[in-house]
């Protein structure tokens, strides 16, 4: 009898422990080593850290970094992160500062990555890799040499890949082709070799008079493409102007994952180039 009672007590204890473990697992807060302000940063952390750090991205790649409404689950992840890496342009964004405040994480290390230029440009991307490796080394000094070694290799890969992309663009005869483009794409479009006649901001911020001026400038210059930015929200501006300008509208992305099957920097830059060359070919066919 005593033996049966003891077995019953042990079984009850085991069941209780399993139930407790299940509850804790279901309700455990997300744990992230590094929260990233963009997919660009998150991808680089993965490369530099060799996939050994858990990362999450605060801002989805297909949305505007300054206008995204951060979700409670993302704030909870930030509350349980050791560090938060952001672009220098994000440090004044209300959605970012608000998320940091709402996370209420006194131990959170915020690293601002001071890199100038469009991160889709190979040289800028390589600089971002270096800055992220340095920041990771400051947080995890025991792994600093490992991070730096990975960063050096990754930067070399990026620059070499960029040369191949540049060759594709030159073969596509983009040098000197006149375009108008979104301000947020000017760095990449200029690097690609296009002649930027004018730039424009977010479509909802443009007045009818500004749109009319853009059309006039584009008509006078004889632009071939109107290049929109995916993350600016509306991608209809170019489409609405192309008939007046006799140009082709195309939308490209500033972040890996913004367009389908572009989860890495290489895939994202290749997709952008594909779209630009396709649009240029379309313009050449209709123009001539």
Annotated model-derived regions:
Residues 1-30, 288:
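Secretory targeting signatures
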Residues 26-30, 105-178, 255-288:
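Extracytoplasmic substrate-binding proteins
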Residues 38, 42, 75-78, 93-97, ...:
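Extracytoplasmic/secreted envelope proteins and their assembly/folding machinery
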Residues 38, 88, 182-183, 230:
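Helix N-cap/beta->alpha junction signal
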């Amino acid at each position: 009898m005593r033996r049966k009672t003891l077995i019953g007590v042990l079984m009850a204890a085991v069941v209780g422990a399993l139930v407790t473990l299940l509850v804790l697992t279901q309700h455990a807060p997300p744990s992230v080593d590094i929260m990233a302000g963009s997919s660009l940063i998150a991808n680089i952390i993965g490369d530099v850290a060799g996939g050994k750090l858990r990362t999450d991205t605060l801002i989805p790649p297909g949305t505007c970094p300054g206008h995204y409404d951060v979700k409670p689950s993302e704030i909870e992840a930030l509350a349980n992160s050791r560090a938060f890496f952001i672009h220098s342009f994000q440090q004044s964004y209300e959605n970012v500062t608000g998320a940091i405040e709402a996370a209420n994480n006194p131990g959170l290390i915020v690293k601002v990555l001071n890199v100038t230029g469009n991160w889709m440009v190979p040289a800028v991307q390589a600089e971002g890799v270096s800055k992220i490796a340095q920041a990771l080394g400051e947080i995890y000094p025991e792994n600093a040499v490992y991070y730096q070694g990975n960063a050096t290799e990754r930067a070399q890969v990026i620059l070499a890949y960029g040369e191949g992309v540049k060759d594709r663009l030159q073969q596509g005869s983009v040098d000197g082709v006149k375009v108008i483009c979104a301000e947020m794409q000017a760095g990449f479009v200029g690097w690609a070799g296009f002649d930027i006649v004018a730039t424009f901001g977010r479509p909802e911020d443009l007045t009818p008079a500004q749109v009319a001026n853009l059309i006039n400038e584009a008509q006078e210059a004889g632009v071939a493409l109107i290049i929109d930015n995916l993350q600016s929200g509306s991608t209809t501006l170019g489409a609405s102007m192309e008939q007046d300008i006799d140009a082709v509208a195309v939308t490209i992305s500033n972040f890996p994952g913004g367009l389908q099957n572009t989860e890495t920097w290489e895939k994202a830059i290749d997709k952008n180039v594909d779209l630009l060359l396709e649009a240029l070919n379309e313009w050449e066919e209709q123009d001539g």
